[in-house]
């Protein structure tokens, strides 16, 4: 059985036992998180209002920061060059089960 969940403005396909990185969530490592399912698949497909009855239980594994990316700006002819970096915060969660 798998489910589609939405958190941080993104959708993820998850199954029991998966560890995924999502946008930063509240809570310490070891805390339990409950997410609503948008779609449930497997032996029987459930979506729409019926999928709202299903919940996905997850546990916070860790908080961290992603790999650094660099953004460069350049304008020709005027010697304008800028480089900035960015590291996105994330939360790793482990999917414990899909219930509904």
From Swiss-Prot:
Gene Ontology molecular function: any one: structural constituent of ribosome
Family of the protein in this entry: Belongs to the bacterial ribosomal protein bL21 family.
GO CC term, one of those recorded: cytoplasm
Pfam family, one: Ribosomal_L21p
Species annotation: Deinococcus radiodurans (strain ATCC 13939 / DSM 20539 / JCM 16871 / CCUG 27074 / LMG 4051 / NBRC 15346 / NCIMB 9279 / VKM B-1422 / R1)
Subunit record text: Part of the 50S ribosomal subunit. Contacts proteins L15 and L20.
SUPFAM superfamilies found in the cross-reference section: L21p-like (SSF141091)
Protein name: Large ribosomal subunit protein bL21
Any one GO BP annotation for this protein: translation
Record keywords: Ribonucleoprotein, Ribosomal protein, RNA-binding, rRNA-binding
Chain segments annotated as coiled-coil in the UniProt record: none
UniProt keyword annotation of Protein biosynthesis present: no
Function: Binds directly to 23S rRNA, probably serving to organize its structure.
InterPro entries associated with the record: bL21-like, bL21-like_sf, Ribosomal_bL21
